[in-house]
Amino acid sequence: MEIENEQICTCIAQILHLLNSLIITFSDDDKTETGQSFVYIDGFLVKKHNNQHTIVNFETYKNKMKVSDRRKFEKANFDEFESALNNKNDLVHCPSITLFESIPTEVRSFYEDEKSGLIKVVKFRTGAMDRKRSFEKIVISVMVGKNVQKFLTFVEDEPDFQGGPIPSKYLIPKKINLMVYTLFQVHTLKFNRKDYDTLSLFYLNRGYYNELSFPCPGTLSRNSECQAERQLYDAYFH
């Protein structure tokens, strides 16, 4: 009788040990990452973790979120992300200036595929001819699915040119000093749509270009010219 009791106890202990292992395994698979937070920006879900901001797919990431966070974003509109997900091009237009001010950008090369007409990112296996006619864009990389990556490029909503010139906030301000005004003849500048897009991208990445451009080595005259350029930059964008 004692032997039977011992066998029963042993079986129960083994069952409990097995159940405990299953519980631990389940908890490890379902656990959430600590020290992370989420924010909704213009149709995208952005994860902040270790001071890094990353766009994530809510549908594939929600099981890793806290219940409170998941409930918070369940009714959010992720149309912009869905648009990027369903876009056949690797390069996707994005009108959200807030997104580009919040997430680090990078420079990538793209080309138009002759067969499909789609814009594709230059990869290791991209042919020499496609590389030769490629162009660079400042982008935010987004993993929209498993092994599926898209690149967002900032393109502001089209202004209404039929209603008149570009709004006054885009005009050269009058606070530029006389030296810069005369040197660059800014009063004669006229911007088309391509110029406007270039200036917008320059503004979004002004810190990057600022580090590349200043200080300017060289002669005194070149330094003076750089100071003038800096004054123009500060006057236009601040």
From Swiss-Prot:
Pfam family for this entry, one: Sir1
InterPro entries: ORC1-binding_dom, Sir1_ORC-binding, Y'_ATP-dependent_helicase
Superkingdom assignment: Eukaryota
Induction field: Down-regulated at low calcium levels.
Family as reported in the entry's similarity comment: Belongs to the helicase family. Yeast subtelomeric Y' repeat subfamily.
Protein name (database record): Putative uncharacterized protein YPR202W
Organism: Saccharomyces cerevisiae (strain ATCC 204508 / S288c) (Baker's yeast)
Taxonomic lineage: Eukaryota, Fungi, Dikarya, Ascomycota, Saccharomycotina
